């Protein structure tokens, strides 16, 4: 993991830093100033940039850059470093090809965007894909017909902004085979779910959650941010829209792993029903390699309940392999 560094700077350097910040944000049609002192942006190489200015940043401007690797992370690489096993990767590939709606959850720094990129590269190359992001960072290489859309901030008068909700609604008129929403944080969760429930199968997205159950609760809260809707109706929308949750985690040794794969099986009128297919189990060995976490993502013995999409895509039960 890349360490974080901090440094004290003179007023001259602070002014120079502000100039650099303005160049960065203006290059992607963003703005940051005292009245709007926080912004997320990106560099030309796709690196994520977070900027905080006075008066929020008391000691002066703060710039945090999260760089991407020079090479694209592949599923093969994730298997090599132990983030996922081959049999689970094959299982997810089958689900992507069969157009299951997959939601990736995890905490900050757990690798959600990286994993979304990797899964996206399983999408057949002849499909039309639309990506929608707050700040463009996805690097999908498997499809030629790719439409990328990015949020536009409002101007200083608070006008002419285009948010994720507007982009999702626009994307529905663009005849996509799949819609990929980089991350849902608020009311746009409802629009994403409605897209999933209106024939746009195979859609992918991510969100912050500490567990699959926590992610479902957070999605309920996000939907309520945008509409006054009965909780049962929200739960029903989530249960019918999302097929699979892949939960990622950053462990105490700073490794990133797939911790759980959960199928959403339905709604019983009160609760969203789930079926855990894979779960990470840590080896209980005292003093193992000086704090290195040892364990494996294991099949629970539960099989995929909703198999209709697999059959509709031309697969049979013999094509499903869960591994150990």
Residues covered by each model-derived region:
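Single conserved hydrophobic/aromatic residue that forms the stacking wall/gate
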Residues: 2-9, 13
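Conserved lysine of the Walker
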Residues: 112
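Hydrophobic positions on the alpha1 helix immediately C-terminal to the Walker A/P-loop
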Residues: 115
């Amino acid at each position: 993991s890349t360490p974080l560094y901090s440094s004290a700077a003179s007023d001259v350097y602070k002014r120079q830093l502000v100039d650099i910040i303005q160049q960065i944000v203006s290059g992607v049609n963003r703005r940051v100033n005292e009245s709007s002192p926080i912004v997320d942006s990106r560099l030309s190489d796709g690196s994520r940039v977070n900027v905080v200015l006075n008066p929020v940043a008391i000691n002066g401007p703060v710039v945090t850059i999260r760089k991407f690797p020079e090479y694209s992370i592949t599923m093969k690489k994730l298997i090599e470093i132990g983030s996922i096993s081959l049999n689970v990767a094959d299982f997810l590939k089958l689900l992507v090809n069969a157009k299951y709606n997959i939601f990736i959850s995890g905490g900050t720094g757990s690798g959600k965007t990286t994993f979304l990129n990797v899964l996206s590269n399983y999408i057949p190359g002849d499909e039309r894909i639309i990506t929608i992001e707050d700040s463009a960072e996805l690097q999908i290489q498997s499809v030629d017909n790719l439409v990328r859309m990015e949020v536009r901030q409002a101007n200083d008068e608070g006008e002419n902004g285009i948010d994720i909700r507007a982009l999702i609604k626009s994307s529905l008129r663009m005849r996509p085979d799949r819609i990929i929403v980089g991350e849902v944080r608020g009311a746009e969760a409802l629009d994403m779910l409605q897209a999933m429930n209106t024939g746009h199968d195979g859609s992918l997205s991510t969100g912050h959650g500490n567990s699959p159950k926590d992610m479902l609760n957070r999605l309920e809260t996000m939907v309520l941010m945008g509409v006054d809707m009965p909780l049962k109706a929200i739960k029903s929308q989530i249960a019918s829209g999302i097929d699979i949750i892949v939960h990622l985690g950053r462990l105490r040794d700073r490794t990133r792993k797939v911790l759980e794969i959960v199928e959403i099986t339905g709604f019983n009128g009160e609760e969203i029903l789930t079926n855990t297919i894979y779960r990470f189990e840590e080896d209980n060995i005292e003093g193992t390699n000086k704090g290195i976490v040892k364990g494996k993502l294991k099949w629970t013995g539960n099989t995929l309940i909703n198999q209709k999409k697999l059959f509709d895509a031309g697969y049979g039960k013999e094509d499903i392999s869960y591994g150990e």
